[in-house]
Design a protein with these regions (language model features):
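OB-fold single-stranded nucleic acid-binding module
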Residues: 1-95
Length: 95
């Protein structure tokens, strides 16, 4: 919890991804280390920003080790970074 509000780089294996058109804002979730709801960290991409990616983020980052840069926030006791651009994410390796 000490890193909330800090601009940082977080890296980890993407355990599962999902694009939720049925939720307000059409979010894409990239969950690190463990699948939802046991993830240790989440990258959130809002639907309004998906067109900035050349490929669907939930497919691009699935089964990859990824680093994301941004401000760490807390949502329902889970840490996350909201990614607005592909420049915030780097694929480190395939799992």
């Amino acid at each position: 919890m000490q890193h909330i509000g800090v601009y940082a780089e977080v890296c980890g294996p993407v355990a599962n991804t999902s694009f939720r058109e049925d939720i307000d804002g059409s979010p894409t979730f990239l969950n690190f280390d463990h699948p939802y709801p046991d993830q240790l960290f989440t990258v959130l991409i809002w639907g309004e920003n998906r067109n900035r990616w050349q490929q669907a983020p939930e497919l691009l980052y699935r089964d990859q080790s990824v680093c994301v840069i941004g401000t760490i926030k807390l949502f329902e006791d889970d840490p996350e970074i909201i990614a607005e651009s592909p420049a915030q994410l780097t694929i480190q390796s395939e799992l």
